[in-house]
Amino acid sequence: MSKLVTYYNDGTIALDTATSLPYTDIILAFLYTTEQEPLSLQLGGGIAASQSPPELTQTTIEAIAALQANGQKVLISFGGGDMSSEAYSKIVGNETELAQSIATFITQYSLDGIDIDFEDTSSFTGTAAYNGVDFLVNLTNALRTELPSPQYLITHAPQPPYLEVDSGMDGYVEVMQQVGDSIDWLNVQFYNNPPWSGDPSEIISSYQLFSELSGLSSEKLLIGLPVTVNDAGSGYISIDDIVSEIIDPIQKDGVLGGMMNWQFSSDNGGNWATTIGTSIGLEAPN
């Protein structure tokens, strides 16, 4: 079954409204660390009652329970576009401790898993103070030790150049070779990344190529797109075009692992979720 995934960050629309939408998985965003406090998790966004120590709001806690009672999974994402290369470099070598801290947060709030939104391109091009592949492999292994399958999910959210062989930043090709079996799926960000941004033909072509990589399959690949033009610097595609130019062609010839969007609060009224969900065979739980 295809998945429909959304990221929940700013809190302008109540999280519990997702119970009436066909999302299979909701990812809360973001946990992160800083250069100044590399081993102390912090929590951002509208879900945070406290940034440090990281604490969810009571409304979020109640919504998580409602979603899970509905058969929907709720994960927390670590990283995000604002986490710096310097912050990552400070936690290298401490992946086990980081994984333990993340697992403690997940079990404290009865969450279903962790998403890694790693966007430090410099760590794949050799210009960072650490090796991004080694870090992600070590962190994924440590997380899977703390969060065993199938009870817990581990997902990653790479940008497409990270999966394009010989792109000069194809670190995730090796990550998937080494620990793909420990990763449940990838939420690939097909936006803010020319030439994929706004180009269905590029997205479909790369989707097919990525699905053939070691450690990957079409079932483990989700296509991530912005809900509105304001949700990304580039890459917006209208709902109708997503269905007719991306989803339908892929499903006609093969398997679509699912769709992801950034972000939940931009889909006021749920039209994106409902239309895209219907096109991949999903209906609202109730």
Predicted regions located by residue number:
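Functionally critical loop-and-helix segments that line ligand-binding/catalytic clefts
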Residues: 262
